[in-house]
Amino acid sequence: SWTSGLLKYKSIPFVKLISELKEKYQVDIIIRNKRLTNPALVVSGTFSEDQSIGDILKVISNSLPFQWKKTDDTYIIK
């Protein structure tokens, strides 16, 4: 959750993180890679609310096997 300008999360499902990012940044994020929707797939990390959603996705994609692209106002995770 967002506290003092930071998004801190520990072992939360990737899909929950994406849901939080969608709400925080008011953007549409579509997960096309069905393996990433598995609730057992968890992520941990801390981000500043000053970071763009693109920066956050870039960092997460370094530790999880996915690629993403932005089309108009929609982020697509492949």
Where are these regions (language model features)?
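A residue-level detector for the "anchor" residue at the start of short, highly conserved motifs
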Residues: 1-78
